[in-house]
Protein backbone atom coordinates (compact mmCIF):
# COMPACT_ATOMS: atom_id res chain seq x y z
CA UNK A 1 0.00 0.00 0.00
CA UNK A 2 2.97 2.34 0.48
CA UNK A 3 3.54 2.38 -3.29
CA UNK A 4 -0.13 2.83 -4.16
CA UNK A 5 -0.26 6.63 -4.01
CA UNK A 6 2.96 7.39 -5.99
CA UNK A 7 2.12 4.65 -8.52
CA UNK A 8 -1.40 6.04 -8.99
CA UNK A 9 -0.12 9.60 -9.38
CA UNK A 10 2.45 8.55 -11.99
CA UNK A 11 -0.19 6.54 -13.85
CA UNK A 12 -2.50 9.56 -13.77
CA UNK A 13 0.28 11.78 -15.10
CA UNK A 14 0.91 9.42 -18.02
CA UNK A 15 -2.82 9.32 -18.90
CA UNK A 16 -3.03 13.12 -18.79
CA UNK A 17 0.06 13.37 -21.02
CA UNK A 18 -1.22 10.77 -23.52
CA UNK A 19 -4.71 9.30 -23.38
CA UNK A 20 -3.57 6.09 -25.10
CA UNK A 21 -1.80 5.20 -21.86
CA UNK A 22 -5.21 4.00 -20.71
CA UNK A 23 -3.93 0.77 -22.28
CA UNK A 24 -1.32 0.55 -19.53
CA UNK A 25 -3.95 1.39 -16.91
CA UNK A 26 -6.00 -1.56 -18.14
CA UNK A 27 -2.89 -3.77 -18.03
CA UNK A 28 -2.20 -2.75 -14.41
CA UNK A 29 -5.80 -3.55 -13.44
CA UNK A 30 -5.63 -6.98 -15.12
CA UNK A 31 -2.33 -7.81 -13.36
CA UNK A 32 -3.75 -6.69 -10.00
CA UNK A 33 -6.88 -8.77 -10.60
CA UNK A 34 -4.80 -11.89 -11.30
CA UNK A 35 -2.74 -11.21 -8.17
CA UNK A 36 -5.90 -10.76 -6.05
CA UNK A 37 -7.52 -13.99 -7.28
CA UNK A 38 -4.31 -16.01 -7.01
CA UNK A 39 -3.42 -14.83 -3.49
CA UNK A 40 -6.98 -14.18 -2.24
CA UNK A 41 -6.04 -10.64 -1.21
CA UNK A 42 -9.57 -9.27 -1.60
CA UNK A 43 -8.76 -5.92 0.02
CA UNK A 44 -6.52 -5.16 -2.97
CA UNK A 45 -9.65 -4.40 -4.99
CA UNK A 46 -9.28 -1.03 -3.28
CA UNK A 47 -6.00 -0.61 -5.19
CA UNK A 48 -7.72 -1.16 -8.53
CA UNK A 49 -10.49 1.30 -7.69
CA UNK A 50 -7.99 3.88 -6.45
CA UNK A 51 -5.65 3.82 -9.46
CA UNK A 52 -8.61 3.98 -11.89
CA UNK A 53 -10.26 6.81 -9.96
CA UNK A 54 -7.06 8.88 -9.79
CA UNK A 55 -6.13 8.31 -13.45
CA UNK A 56 -9.54 8.91 -15.02
CA UNK A 57 -10.40 11.67 -12.56
CA UNK A 58 -7.16 13.57 -13.23
CA UNK A 59 -7.79 13.54 -16.99
CA UNK A 60 -11.28 14.95 -16.49
CA UNK A 61 -10.01 17.53 -13.99
CA UNK A 62 -7.59 18.94 -16.58
CA UNK A 63 -10.47 19.41 -19.04
CA UNK A 64 -12.66 21.01 -16.36
CA UNK A 65 -9.81 23.35 -15.44
CA UNK A 66 -9.45 24.60 -19.03
CA UNK A 67 -13.22 25.01 -19.34
CA UNK A 68 -13.44 27.04 -16.15
CA UNK A 69 -10.57 29.37 -17.07
CA UNK A 70 -11.70 29.88 -20.67
CA UNK A 71 -15.44 29.93 -20.04
CA UNK A 72 -15.87 27.59 -23.02
CA UNK A 73 -17.49 24.16 -23.01
CA UNK A 74 -14.91 21.92 -24.69
CA UNK A 75 -17.38 19.10 -25.20
CA UNK A 76 -16.36 15.47 -25.62
CA UNK A 77 -14.02 15.98 -28.55
CA UNK A 78 -13.38 13.28 -31.13
CA UNK A 79 -14.65 9.89 -29.93
CA UNK A 80 -12.49 6.78 -30.18
CA UNK A 81 -14.87 5.18 -32.68
CA UNK A 82 -13.77 7.77 -35.27
CA UNK A 83 -10.14 6.69 -34.79
CA UNK A 84 -11.26 3.07 -35.21
CA UNK A 85 -12.92 4.03 -38.49
CA UNK A 86 -9.72 5.77 -39.62
CA UNK A 87 -7.66 2.72 -38.64
CA UNK A 88 -9.76 0.47 -40.86
CA UNK A 89 -9.44 2.68 -43.95
CA UNK A 90 -6.72 3.27 -46.52
CA UNK A 91 -4.19 6.06 -46.17
CA UNK A 92 -1.68 7.76 -48.47
CA UNK A 93 1.16 6.47 -46.27
CA UNK A 94 0.13 2.91 -45.36
CA UNK A 95 -3.11 1.02 -44.62
CA UNK A 96 -4.81 2.30 -41.49
CA UNK A 97 -2.33 5.12 -40.87
CA UNK A 98 -3.18 8.69 -39.92
CA UNK A 99 -5.36 10.09 -42.71
CA UNK A 100 -7.14 13.11 -41.18
CA UNK A 101 -10.38 11.15 -41.45
CA UNK A 102 -11.41 11.36 -37.78
CA UNK A 103 -11.00 15.13 -37.65
CA UNK A 104 -12.75 15.66 -40.99
CA UNK A 105 -15.75 13.56 -39.95
CA UNK A 106 -16.04 15.46 -36.67
CA UNK A 107 -15.84 18.86 -38.38
CA UNK A 108 -18.29 17.85 -41.13
CA UNK A 109 -20.74 16.85 -38.39
CA UNK A 110 -20.42 20.38 -36.94
CA UNK A 111 -18.81 18.92 -33.80
CA UNK A 112 -21.91 16.81 -33.19
CA UNK A 113 -20.63 13.59 -31.57
CA UNK A 114 -23.79 11.58 -32.21
CA UNK A 115 -23.86 12.42 -35.91
CA UNK A 116 -20.12 11.79 -36.36
CA UNK A 117 -20.34 8.50 -34.43
CA UNK A 118 -23.27 7.36 -36.59
CA UNK A 119 -21.28 8.04 -39.77
CA UNK A 120 -18.30 6.20 -38.34
CA UNK A 121 -20.37 3.15 -37.33
CA UNK A 122 -21.89 2.95 -40.82
CA UNK A 123 -18.47 3.14 -42.47
CA UNK A 124 -17.00 0.58 -40.04
CA UNK A 125 -19.75 -1.89 -40.96
CA UNK A 126 -18.97 -1.39 -44.66
CA UNK A 127 -15.25 -1.92 -44.07
CA UNK A 128 -15.85 -5.06 -41.99
CA UNK A 129 -18.08 -6.46 -44.74
CA UNK A 130 -15.32 -5.80 -47.28
CA UNK A 131 -12.76 -7.57 -45.06
CA UNK A 132 -15.18 -10.49 -44.66
CA UNK A 133 -15.88 -10.82 -48.37
CA UNK A 134 -12.30 -10.33 -49.58
CA UNK A 135 -9.87 -12.30 -47.41
CA UNK A 136 -6.90 -11.50 -49.66
CA UNK A 137 -7.50 -7.76 -49.29
CA UNK A 138 -8.03 -8.15 -45.52
CA UNK A 139 -4.80 -10.08 -45.01
CA UNK A 140 -2.87 -7.67 -47.21
CA UNK A 141 -4.32 -4.64 -45.40
CA UNK A 142 -3.49 -5.77 -41.87
CA UNK A 143 -0.12 -7.32 -42.70
CA UNK A 144 1.01 -4.07 -44.29
CA UNK A 145 -0.42 -2.04 -41.41
CA UNK A 146 1.39 -4.13 -38.79
CA UNK A 147 4.70 -4.25 -40.65
CA UNK A 148 4.67 -0.55 -41.53
CA UNK A 149 4.33 0.32 -37.85
CA UNK A 150 6.47 -2.26 -36.07
CA UNK A 151 9.12 -2.90 -38.71
CA UNK A 152 9.98 0.74 -39.45
CA UNK A 153 13.30 1.05 -37.60
CA UNK A 154 13.43 4.85 -37.23
CA UNK A 155 9.84 5.11 -35.95
CA UNK A 156 9.54 8.31 -38.00
CA UNK A 157 12.20 10.04 -35.89
CA UNK A 158 13.87 11.48 -38.99
CA UNK A 159 10.85 11.75 -41.27
CA UNK A 160 8.73 13.73 -38.80
CA UNK A 161 11.38 16.43 -38.75
CA UNK A 162 12.08 16.23 -42.47
CA UNK A 163 8.53 17.18 -43.47
CA UNK A 164 8.54 20.34 -41.37
CA UNK A 165 9.13 23.79 -42.84
CA UNK A 166 12.64 24.28 -41.48
CA UNK A 167 13.88 21.35 -43.61
CA UNK A 168 13.55 23.42 -46.77
CA UNK A 169 15.47 26.32 -45.25
CA UNK A 170 18.40 25.95 -42.86
CA UNK A 171 18.68 22.15 -43.21
CA UNK A 172 19.36 22.20 -46.97
CA UNK A 173 21.95 24.91 -46.43
CA UNK A 174 23.82 22.85 -43.80
CA UNK A 175 25.86 19.99 -45.31
CA UNK A 176 25.89 17.88 -42.14
CA UNK A 177 22.18 18.24 -41.44
CA UNK A 178 21.32 17.51 -45.06
CA UNK A 179 23.44 14.35 -44.89
CA UNK A 180 21.46 13.22 -41.84
CA UNK A 181 18.25 13.33 -43.88
CA UNK A 182 19.49 12.30 -47.34
CA UNK A 183 23.19 11.42 -47.40
CA UNK A 184 25.70 8.98 -45.92
CA UNK A 185 24.82 9.79 -42.32
CA UNK A 186 21.20 8.97 -43.11
CA UNK A 187 22.18 5.57 -44.52
CA UNK A 188 24.38 4.85 -41.50
CA UNK A 189 21.58 5.79 -39.08
CA UNK A 190 19.01 3.64 -40.86
CA UNK A 191 21.41 0.66 -40.98
CA UNK A 192 22.08 1.12 -37.26
CA UNK A 193 18.37 1.48 -36.44
CA UNK A 194 17.58 -1.60 -38.54
CA UNK A 195 20.24 -3.73 -36.85
CA UNK A 196 19.31 -2.53 -33.35
CA UNK A 197 15.62 -3.21 -33.98
CA UNK A 198 16.29 -6.69 -35.33
CA UNK A 199 18.48 -7.61 -32.34
CA UNK A 200 15.87 -6.22 -29.95
CA UNK A 201 13.05 -8.28 -31.50
CA UNK A 202 15.10 -11.50 -31.44
CA UNK A 203 16.24 -11.02 -27.85
CA UNK A 204 12.73 -9.95 -26.83
CA UNK A 205 11.32 -13.27 -28.09
CA UNK A 206 14.03 -15.19 -26.21
CA UNK A 207 13.47 -13.16 -23.05
CA UNK A 208 9.69 -13.62 -23.07
CA UNK A 209 10.05 -17.37 -23.73
CA UNK A 210 12.44 -17.58 -20.78
CA UNK A 211 10.08 -15.70 -18.48
CA UNK A 212 7.09 -17.84 -19.48
CA UNK A 213 9.12 -20.98 -18.80
CA UNK A 214 10.16 -19.53 -15.46
CA UNK A 215 6.52 -18.57 -14.62
CA UNK A 216 5.69 -14.93 -15.00
CA UNK A 217 5.33 -12.62 -12.03
CA UNK A 218 2.42 -10.18 -11.75
CA UNK A 219 4.74 -7.38 -12.90
CA UNK A 220 5.75 -9.33 -16.01
CA UNK A 221 2.11 -10.13 -16.81
CA UNK A 222 1.27 -6.44 -16.49
CA UNK A 223 3.97 -5.34 -18.95
CA UNK A 224 3.23 -8.11 -21.46
CA UNK A 225 -0.49 -7.32 -21.26
CA UNK A 226 0.29 -3.66 -21.95
CA UNK A 227 2.40 -4.60 -24.97
CA UNK A 228 -0.31 -6.92 -26.29
CA UNK A 229 -2.92 -4.23 -25.72
CA UNK A 230 -0.85 -1.67 -27.61
CA UNK A 231 -0.33 -4.10 -30.49
CA UNK A 232 -4.07 -4.85 -30.77
CA UNK A 233 -5.09 -1.21 -30.37
CA UNK A 234 -2.78 0.10 -33.11
CA UNK A 235 -3.67 -2.81 -35.39
CA UNK A 236 -7.32 -1.77 -35.28
CA UNK A 237 -7.27 1.96 -34.58
CA UNK A 238 -5.40 4.78 -36.34
CA UNK A 239 -1.78 3.77 -36.78
CA UNK A 240 1.69 5.27 -37.10
CA UNK A 241 5.13 3.84 -36.40
CA UNK A 242 5.60 6.90 -34.20
CA UNK A 243 2.84 5.61 -31.92
CA UNK A 244 4.51 2.26 -31.20
CA UNK A 245 7.92 3.69 -30.25
CA UNK A 246 6.98 3.69 -26.55
CA UNK A 247 6.20 -0.03 -26.74
CA UNK A 248 9.52 -0.73 -28.44
CA UNK A 249 11.34 0.98 -25.56
CA UNK A 250 9.50 -1.28 -23.09
CA UNK A 251 10.55 -4.32 -25.16
CA UNK A 252 14.21 -3.48 -24.54
CA UNK A 253 13.79 -4.60 -20.90
CA UNK A 254 12.81 -8.09 -22.02
CA UNK A 255 15.57 -8.04 -24.64
CA UNK A 256 18.19 -7.46 -21.96
CA UNK A 257 16.91 -10.55 -20.15
CA UNK A 258 17.00 -12.47 -23.43
CA UNK A 259 20.65 -11.48 -23.88
CA UNK A 260 21.36 -12.63 -20.33
CA UNK A 261 19.84 -16.04 -21.09
CA UNK A 262 21.97 -16.35 -24.23
CA UNK A 263 25.34 -15.46 -22.76
CA UNK A 264 24.83 -17.10 -19.37
CA UNK A 265 23.10 -20.49 -19.52
CA UNK A 266 22.85 -22.75 -16.45
CA UNK A 267 26.26 -24.36 -16.88
CA UNK A 268 27.99 -21.18 -18.11
CA UNK A 269 30.32 -20.90 -15.10
CA UNK A 270 31.46 -24.49 -15.55
CA UNK A 271 32.35 -24.09 -19.21
CA UNK A 272 35.89 -23.66 -20.36
CA UNK A 273 37.06 -20.42 -21.99
CA UNK A 274 36.98 -22.08 -25.40
CA UNK A 275 33.37 -23.19 -24.88
CA UNK A 276 32.39 -19.70 -23.78
CA UNK A 277 34.01 -18.25 -26.87
CA UNK A 278 32.21 -20.78 -29.07
CA UNK A 279 28.87 -19.75 -27.53
CA UNK A 280 29.56 -16.09 -28.29
CA UNK A 281 30.68 -16.89 -31.84
CA UNK A 282 27.54 -18.94 -32.48
CA UNK A 283 25.37 -16.04 -31.41
CA UNK A 284 27.30 -13.63 -33.63
CA UNK A 285 27.00 -15.95 -36.63
CA UNK A 286 23.22 -16.25 -36.21
CA UNK A 287 22.76 -12.49 -35.90
CA UNK A 288 24.97 -11.56 -38.84
CA UNK A 289 23.44 -14.29 -41.00
CA UNK A 290 19.96 -12.85 -40.38
CA UNK A 291 21.25 -9.32 -40.96
CA UNK A 292 22.85 -10.23 -44.29
CA UNK A 293 19.63 -11.88 -45.50
CA UNK A 294 17.65 -8.82 -44.44
CA UNK A 295 19.96 -6.51 -46.39
CA UNK A 296 19.75 -8.71 -49.51
CA UNK A 297 15.95 -8.70 -49.42
Where are these regions (language model features)?
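Hydrophobic/aromatic-rich transmembrane helices and adjacent perimembrane loops
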Residues: 13-28, 195-198, 223, 233, ...
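Aromatic-anchored segments of alpha-helical transmembrane domains
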Residues: 12-16, 55-60, 226-235
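Membrane-interface alpha helices of multi-pass inner-membrane proteins
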Residues: 4-18, 29, 51-56
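Membrane-interface anchor segments at the N-terminal boundary of transmembrane helices
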Residues: 144-223, 227
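Perimembrane helix-loop-helix junctions
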Residues: 24-57
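Transmembrane alpha-helices and membrane-interface helical segments
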Residues: 24-36, 203-211, 227-231, 248-265
Amino acid sequence: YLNLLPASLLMALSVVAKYNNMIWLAAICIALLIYIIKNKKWLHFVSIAFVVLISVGSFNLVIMSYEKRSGVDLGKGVDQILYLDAGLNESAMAPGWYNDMAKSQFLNANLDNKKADTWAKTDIKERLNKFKQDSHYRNNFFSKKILSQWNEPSYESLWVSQVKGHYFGEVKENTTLYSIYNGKINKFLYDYFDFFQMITFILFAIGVAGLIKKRCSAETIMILTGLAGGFIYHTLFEGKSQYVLTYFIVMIMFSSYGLYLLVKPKNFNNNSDSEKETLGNKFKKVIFKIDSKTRQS
